[in-house]
Amino acid sequence: MVRPRSGIVLVLCAPSGTGKTTLTRRLLEEFPRFAFSVSYTTRQPRAGEEHGREYNFVDEETFIRLRDEGFFAEWAEVHGNFYGTPLEDTRQLLARGRDVLFDIDVQGAAQLRGSLKQGCYVFILPPSGAELERRLRARGTDPEDTIRRRLANARRELQQAHWFNAWIVNDNLEQAYDELRAAYLAATLSPTCRPELVDELLQDWR
């Protein structure tokens, strides 16, 4: 009898305005096997948030101690607050066969690549710089300096896209989702998800 596969890490990175949130939401709706490990943060809880549900809220001293002990699979400082994903919690989810989705920046993805091996790294690309700028302006929510900063960040992120497993251009939402879905399903067939499969089949060969 073939044992179920272990879980995989699916890491999605994209510049702001590329449509990653919409694609992520659709993937989670279709595949309930995905799970999230609860991250740690030093920021203050917002209204309605609970410790252990949205985040594990800790002070900066505790976070830095955990970071230095190698507790996090990845961590980052964002707007003066620290955020980190617990490594052991993620490993336990994977061992139970749950797939873990990360929606993080390129720096966090690079850290994950070093700490978690069975990962699929997908970069969502805009059709062009001009189209990305059009989308950001169409939101009507960001001031000019924020738009310029997001465009500059997008350029820097694109310069690091070469090491990802898959590139998906979100020019058409349906096509982009089909490609993301295909990349995810292909990753679940990797031998790293069932490293013992062939040896077990050979042992039971008749």
Swiss-Prot record:
Cellular component per GO, a single term: cytosol
Subcellular compartments: Cytoplasm
SUPFAM superfamilies, per the entry: P-loop containing nucleoside triphosphate hydrolases
Record-annotated Guanylate kinase-like domain positions: 7-185
EC number: 2.7.4.8
Domain of life: Bacteria
Binding site for ATP: 14-21
Reaction it catalyzes: GMP + ATP = GDP + ADP
Predominant location: cytoplasm
Keyword Kinase: yes
GO molecular function annotations of the record: ATP binding; guanylate kinase activity
Keywords: ATP-binding, Cytoplasm, Kinase, Nucleotide-binding, Transferase
Xref: NCBIfam families: guanyl_kin (TIGR03263)
Its biological purpose: Essential for recycling GMP and indirectly, cGMP.
Similarity field: Belongs to the guanylate kinase family.
HAMAP family the record matches: Guanylate_kinase (MF_00328)
Protein name according to UniProt: Guanylate kinase
Source taxonomy: Bacteria, Pseudomonadati, Thermodesulfobacteriota, Desulfovibrionia, Desulfovibrionales
Primary gene name: gmk
